[in-house]
Regions:
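Soluble, non-transmembrane catalytic domains of enzymes that act on hydrophobic metabolites at membranes
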Residues: 1, 125, 138, 145, ...
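A hydrophobic, helix-centered structural microdomain
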Residues: 2-3, 8-81, 195-235
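Positions in alpha-helical segments
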Residues: 29, 57, 98-102, 134, ...
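Short, hydrophobic secondary-structure boundary micro-motifs
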Residues: 43, 58, 85-86, 126-128, ...
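Short, P/G- and charge-enriched loop/turn segments at secondary-structure junctions
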Residues: 46, 87-88, 144-148, 179-180, ...
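Gly/Ser/Thr-rich beta-alpha loop segments that engage phosphate groups in nucleotides
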Residues: 55, 65, 123, 129, ...
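Short, glycine-rich, amphipathic interfacial segments at transmembrane boundaries or analogous
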Residues: 57-96, 158-186, 190
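A short, structured surface patch at a secondary-structure boundary
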Residues: 90-153, 208
Length: 235
């Protein structure tokens, strides 16, 4: 007599995924801290002797279940930048960005201190990007309700697809905040919700690989080749 093993429930699968994801997050975050420590020290030195001497930038972001937390980033802009110019919207060649900060932003190195948020449990390596309240409010109500059922991530499908967000906003004749709200936010919300529905260890591993790939090859369309049903961007 063959006894069939009962299929795992959605809750069991979700719990297993959450457990494995947390282990991977800790392993990757610790590895980054240890391997890149000398590099981090060099960046800290450069930031101390250039610009305004600021090293880390702490900012309140929306996290899992829409709870706020404080994010770590390398400082790339002048002090009080949120209250200057376009606020939370950053433009290409934004005058608020410091000389060193410009290169940190292009290479996304400014995001690496968020491994500390990963170790603290506020963030994951992969997930929807954590937003400030003003840009979070640009999302449709359904997206606001669902997007942070997953922990926010250092990278994710939204981060990859909109890696040229600053360029898009700068090239538009529409006022930046309106362009973000009317054009970018609706589609960006769609792709972040796509991740929530398709998240798995394999999906996360693919996204991590694709993140590295598009940093080296910015024009690559690998994200859409890897995930065929990902909502397409038509602008």
């Amino acid at each position: 007599m063959i006894i069939r093993r009962p299929e795992e429930t959605w809750i069991q699968k979700c719990s297993m995924y959450t457990f494995v994801k947390r282990i991977l997050d800790i392993v990757i975050a610790l590895s980054v801290c240890l391997l890149l420590l000398p590099f981090f020290l060099l960046i800290i030195l450069l930031l101390r002797i250039s610009g305004e001497g600021e090293v880390f930038y702490r900012q309140t972001r929306i996290g899992q279940y829409n709870k706020e937390f404080r994010i770590f980033k390398f400082a790339t802009m002048v002090r009080d930048s949120l209250n200057i110019g376009t606020g939370a919207i950053t433009l290409r060649n934004d005058p608020r960005v410091t000389p060193v900060g410009k290169y940190l932003r292009i290479t996304k190195i400014n995001e690496l201190p968020q491994v500390l948020n990963v170790l603290l449990g506020d963030m994951s390596i992969v997930g929807p990007r954590p937003l400030v309240m003003s840009t979070f409010n640009a999302y449709p109500a359904l997206v606001q309700k669902e997007i942070y059922q997953s922990k926010p991530g250092i990278t994710g499908v939204g981060s990859i697809i909109y890696r040229d967000e600053e360029k898009l906003i700068s090239a538009s004749s529409i006022e930046p905040k309106i362009y973000y709200e009317k054009v970018i936010a609706p589609h960006k919300g769609e792709v972040e919700l796509w991740y929530n529905k398709h998240k798995s260890v394999l999906t996360d591993v693919k996204i991590i690989f694709i993140t590295g790939w598009v940093i080296l090859f910015p024009q690559s369309n690998l994200i859409y080749k890897s995930f065929k049903d990902l909502p397409k961007r038509d602008f």
